[in-house]
Design a protein with these regions (language model features):
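Conserved catalytic cores of phosphodiester-cleaving nucleases, focusing on short active-site segments
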Residues: 63-69
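Non-catalytic C-terminal interaction segments of nucleic acid-processing enzymes
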Residues: 1-61, 72-165
C-alpha cells in the first residue's frame, strides 16, 4: 500500500455507500499510457457533515459529493416548493464550499423518465445543476453489489479530484 485516504461519510446517510478497503488505481506520477498501477488504502469514518454526504478528509474544499437515493427524492427536491428551496440552499453551499461539487443520483435514465413527473423533475434538476455548477453522476444502486460499485466510483472520483486540483 503506497497511500492512505480517509473518506468521511455523513452520519445522516440512511443507506450508505460501501467502500472497498483497497483500490488499485492508475499511478498519477507516471504517464497514463504506461499503465502503472498503485494500491491505495481506504478508511471510512462517520461524521456529521454540514454540506454533502461524502468527502475526502483533508480535501474538503476540492470535492464534495451529495447523494440522492431515488427519483422520488429528486422529484420532491426539484418540483415542490419547500423541498426545492432547501435543495437550492444545498446547491449554494456546495458551490461555495468546494471547487468540484458532485451530485450522485442513484437510478437509471429509464427509471427517471418513466415515472409520472419524472421527465419534469429531470428538466428541473438539469437546470438547477447548470445554474449552480454541479456535476451529475447517474449510477444504479439499491442492492449491495451496486452500492459497492457506486462506493468505488465515488472513492475514485474523490481521490482523482484531489490529485488533479
Amino acid at each position: 500500500v503506497q497511500r492512505k485516504y480517509v473518506i468521511v461519510q455523513d452520519t445522516r446517510e440512511k443507506l450508505p455507500l460501501l467502500f472497498p478497503k483497497r483500490l488499485v488505481m492508475l499511478d498519477d506520477t507516471r504517464p497514463a499510457p504506461e499503465k502503472k498501477a498503485i494500491t491505495v488504502e481506504l478508511h471510512t469514518v462517520r461524521q456529521k457533515l454540514q454540506t454533502g454526504d461524502y468527502i475526502l478528509s483533508g480535501s474538503e474544499s476540492t470535492c464534495i459529493v451529495e447523494r440522492k437515493g431515488s427519483l422520488l427524492e429528486i422529484s420532491k427536491n426539484c418540483l415542490h416548493g419547500g423541498d426545492r428551496r432547501r435543495f437550492v440552499r444545498e446547491l449554494v453551499r456546495l458551490r461555495e464550499e468546494t471547487s468540484h461539487p458532485v451530485l450522485v443520483l442513484e437510478g437509471s435514465p429509464a427509471q427517471l423518465l418513466d415515472a409520472g413527473e419524472g421527465s419534469l423533475a429531470v428538466d428541473a434538476l438539469i437546470r438547477l445543476l447548470q445554474e449552480y455548477g454541479c456535476e451529475l453522476l447517474l449510477l444504479p444502486s439499491g442492492i449491495a453489489k451496486h452500492r459497492r460499485a457506486l462506493g468505488e466510483w465515488v472513492a475514485r472520483l474523490l481521490i482523482n479530484r484531489t490529485l488533479h486540483d
